[in-house]
Amino acid sequence: MVNTIKKSKGVFIMVEQDTIRLLRECDAGVKMGVSSIDDVLKYVKSERLRKDLTDNREEHCKLDKDLQELLDQYHDDGKDPNPMAKSMSWMKTNMKLVMNESDHTIADLITDGCNMGVKSLNKYLNEYKAADEKSKDICKRLINLEEDLTIQMRQFL
């Protein structure tokens, strides 16, 4: 009986740790996505591209609300994007747009960012297998948002 309780507690702790870790990575991903969209919006010329980006940004924000509720349940503050990754993204965005301020360039940058996000989120989904289903669902929803935006960007490439 004692071994079962210890094992059960160990499993519970593992689930909670993986859940929090996955939620943190999703939090950083949502923030990075919103920030990246914000960085390019002022350069957008096409109303269709502006609408696609704005709609996706709103979906990121809705998902962030659900994410913050789950993080609050675990008394966790979440995670900001890696400062180095964020500054490198900002530099790449601004350098490319200074050289070629076009919707094509914006679509290219957003596609690259989404692909990196999808890759990272799938890695974390595989790494934190013990995470609860709610956090896995949030992660999958974020992956779908990124994949959908990539598809929307194709017409501007």
Which residue stretches match the model-derived regions?
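Alpha-helical bundle segments that constitute or directly flank the non-heme di-iron/ferroxidase center
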Residues: 14-44, 105-129
